[in-house]
Curated annotation (Swiss-Prot):
Membership in a protein family: Belongs to the major facilitator superfamily.
Gene: mpsC
Chain spans, region Disordered: 1-65
Taxonomic source organism: Macrophomina phaseolina (strain MS6) (Charcoal rot fungus)
Main subcellular location of this protein, as a coarse class: membrane
GO cellular component term, pick one: membrane
Record's keyword terms, sorted: Glycoprotein, Membrane, Transmembrane, Transmembrane helix, Transport
Physiological role: MFS-type transporper; part of the gene cluster that mediates the biosynthesis of macrophasetins, 3-decalinoyltetramic acids (DTAs) which feature a tetramate (pyrrolidine-2,4-dione) unit connected to a decalin fragment and that have potent bioactivities. Efflux pump that might be required for efficient secretion of macrophasetins.
The protein, known as: MFS-type transporper mpsC
InterPro entries documented for this protein: MFS (IPR011701), MFS_dom (IPR020846), MFS_trans_sf (IPR036259)
Basic and acidic residues bias (residue ranges): 1-35
Compartmental location: Membrane
Record field: transmembrane: 74-94, 108-128, 147-167, 169-189, 201-221, 228-248, 303-323, 342-362, 383-403, 411-431, 443-465, 476-496
Amino acid sequence: MTSSTESKHSNDESTDLEKQDAEESHGLPEERKQDIAAQLSSSDVQDPNLVDWDGPDDPANPMNWPKSKRLGHVVMASLTTLFANITSTAFAPAASSLEAEFGITSSITAALTVSIYLLGFAFGPLVIAPLSEHFGRLPVYRVCTVITVAFLIGCAQAKNLGMFLVFRLITGIAGSGPGTIGGGTIADVMAPENRGKAMGAFAMGPLMGPVLGPLMSGFIAQYLDWRWVFRVLCIATGVMTIVLYFVMTETYGPVLLKRKAARLRKETGNPDLHTKLEASGVSPLASLWMALQRPTKMLIFSPITLLLSLYCAFVFGLLILLFTTFSAVYRQQYGFNVSMGGLSYLGLGFGLAIGLVLFGMLSDKVAKKDSARSSEWKPEARLLLMVWFAPVIPGGFFWYGWTAYYKVHWILPMMGTSLIGMGALMVMMPIQVYLVDAFGPRVAASALAANTLLRSLAGCFLPLAGPSLYEALGLGWGNTLLGFIAIGFTCLPILFYRFGGKLRLRFPVTF
């Protein structure tokens, strides 16, 4: 009963897609046809029971959906990721009122109330990404957003510190879902040469979310209390969850093909019909176990994944360190109150916004131009922007540290953090797009999960060192130390730009 209903729905949907696509474009661009053809098996006449896409123009393939539908999924993936990342730091301006209510005196414990969310961001992807590659993207989006809403309510109603920390950790685990599989969703619906702008929109979540959070919650914390921060987040995330349920559909190709094979087996009565994945002879349980291991294995056996994820983690950890110390720095150095403290994030936010615009304008153009010299698409071309902008980060730290130390007008430290924000985006975004392009839709979510694991661990634990670092070395030398470490990382994009192709061949992801 269910299968026949699904069959009828699928046939109707395919007919609609064919009509819309024909009206929209009268044929696919040749570049997209070539990319889709790469997903198809070579006409395997030796296996007439193999179920695959019906050629490169198959309207059921998410790559061939109408542009509006594909962009709709990019927007939803980006917005759900943005909301999850707003939640990561929105609580920061209100942390002092929670500390007073629960009698927190340790600076490390105080920082943990904000950063423990990112501990959930670290470990959630290790399970969430493999589940999306086994069961599909859509169930993961739905389950994660519902759990997030439920535990945001828990945070708002917490009666003691232990309860709050547990609820916030679980919120972080569930909140990591959209960011973990969003890159996979984009890989499902966008051709490699057109992913730059889509990934730029997606980057608003991990990079702009932590900036927008304190800006939005600063006045709530000033005039209400910390519990209302979580209530507002719960309402906003709940609305987004309802929209997601009505707008998003499944995009993961292997899952769609498995459904197609099941439908055809029922319609034709041929039990031998199968997909390439089903033909591998691997049981569903074994396939799930392999998928669960994949992110960890990529960190161990792929130097590309490990080293670039370490760089991304360091940069992200620096951003969260700044987020958790801005309020104290601007209060002590410039006398900002709680509501004004949210304004201290503007410089970093402005820099991230500038970086986002630059990345959207330049990424695809630079990558296509660089690849054209070798007459083939080269994922390493994505790293060229990173080579150019990586030195901006240490420069920003030197500027911010010493202007804040000498209490120069508050606009100047913000200008320094603008440089940090722009440089951070132009480092982190090329890494994420490169991982998607280098490993392809099949394991893109696992590659990003491995990246998210290290990034979130750094985001959780590096900020804990911030107060002690500034207390021991001061704002000037403390930020100078961070800048010098950042200089050491600038050689990585150059090395991977030149030798990344050879490393991909030397260490292929076959697991």
